[in-house]
Amino acid sequence: MSASKHIICEYSSEDPSKDFEVHNPATGAVIAIVRAGDATTLDKAVQVAHKAFLEWKKVPLTRRSQLMFKCAEEVEKHAEELAELLTTENGKLLSDGRMVDVNFVSQVYRYFGSLIDKLPGEFHDSGSVYRYVTREPHGVCGGILPFNWPPIHTAGKSAPCIAMGNTIIIKPGEQAPLTSMRIVDILNTVLPKGVVQYVPGVGPEVPQALTAHPLVKMVSITGSTTAGKAVVMAASALVKPTVLELGGKNALVVFPDADLHRAARDALEGAFFNKGEACTATSRLLIHNDIYDAFIEKYAAAVCKLQAGNGLKKGTHVGPCVTQAQKERVLDFIRIGEEEGATIAAQGRLPDDAEEKDGFFVAPTLFTNVKHSMRIAQEEIFGPVVTACKFDSEEEAVSIINGARWGLTCAIYSGNQELALRMCRQVDVGMTFINNYFRNTLGIPFGGVKETGYGREHCIDTLKDWSTSKVIQMPSGLAPVPSWPPVNELLPWQ
């Protein structure tokens, strides 16, 4: 990737009309102009990736592991650079980018590098034959990324992919592509050419070309439900496997016997960490009617203290939305909430620095008097907005949670362990939390159900998504292999 402001990378189009701007969301200033790829340059990338795959799949597991550990070391050398770049193009807090996003890259490369030779195989002895089940790589794969966690998604897709012997082409989120591109450049100082590549793009052109390419054998996307469905439709034409992580409308449920202070703390983090631009954001608070007023009083006071601002500055709690369009989307939902009859019970503070007057800021917002049928309680807003609804019983809470289109997470706060465990089994989500909302999921399955998608990331089962099973069978020599009776009659053993 060029260090100049105008970035033309290896697989950029020759067409200058493919240029697109990347902004600093804290100031609105253009920080880079990137030349997107197109179907032609995507094909070139696929051809390079396919050639690399034919050699990479033969690299011994121990060597593959060594290279992945080396990748982790190289990324760590650039940790501060990556964190600052991430905040500059995405808007998240520098401390969060450093502690969470960038650290995850090295962690996930070491994790999957250490698992390469530990994926359990299967051996079946049926008496007359031995059957061994092993895993084979798909080939060239595609990884389509969103804008909210560029390092996490770049590593979360590329690490298990190449660990299993595949090669991958990354399509970064167009709103914040620079960090993903830089990470791939760093990885390529270690890996053979073509193992991990990126093709930038705007809109559906590059993802469609990637998904429909006959040499691309598997695609994983993290993004909107609309984008995910488009990938599934294109992949189905070639009967191509996909992995989908498409968002959530997650609930944090508080019962009367809960520790209200703990619940309020976790609800504050769940709603406003990463400025609410997280598929795991707990944007729906379900508060039992008996404690609703007490909880809201405590929670609203904290929301009012939240300071929106530049993620590079100390004292900032909530960064800007990633783009002006995302800001307008969130503000539209705030207007919709008021029109639907909900009440803005609390809002955080907007920045007053002149440098940030053109930034994409939205005041952190808490809605009360929310009915479960309202759009703000049903749709994924993807911004610093949280709704607080009342419920009266466990059954009602379960019904509200399961009424959402998505099913990613649910957090339950109660002193009654039996109730909490029972609810965990009843809610239609992929991940549940009892009296905590700690979302570092490396090592356990990350993913959901319903319109959240399918497949699991960040765990040993992820390696199965990035590979396919193969059966190897041979006679055991211990007993005759069964055969069709007419064969014994027409071609008897000599």
Curated annotation (Swiss-Prot):
Catalytic residues of the enzyme: 245, 279
Keyword Phosphoprotein found: no
Function: Aldehyde dehydrogenase; part of the gene cluster that mediates the biosynthesis of the selective antifungal agent ascochitine, an o-quinone methide that plays a possible protective role against other microbial competitors in nature and is considered to be important for pathogenicity of legume-associated Didymella species. The pathway probably begins with the synthesis of a keto-aldehyde intermediate by the ascochitine non-reducing polyketide synthase pksAC from successive condensations of 4 malonyl-CoA units, presumably with a simple acetyl-CoA starter unit.
Keywords: NAD, Oxidoreductase, Virulence
Reactions accelerated catalytically: an aldehyde + NAD(+) + H2O = a carboxylate + NADH + 2 H(+)
Cysteine disulfide partners in this protein: none
Family of the protein in this entry: Belongs to the aldehyde dehydrogenase family.
Segment forming the signal sequence: none
InterPro entries, alphabetized: Ald_DH/histidinol_DH (IPR016161), Ald_DH_C (IPR016163), Ald_DH_CS_CYS (IPR016160), Ald_DH_CS_GLU (IPR029510), Ald_DH_N (IPR016162), Aldehyde_DH_dom (IPR015590)
Top-level class of the enzyme under EC nomenclature: oxidoreductase
UniProt pathway: Mycotoxin biosynthesis
GO MF term list: aldehyde dehydrogenase (NAD+) activity
Binding annotation for NAD(+): 223-228
Name of the protein this chain belongs to: Aldehyde dehydrogenase
Source species of the chain: Didymella fabae (Leaf and pod spot disease fungus)
Listed PANTHER family: ALDEHYDE DEHYDROGENASE-RELATED
EC number of the protein: 1.2.1.3
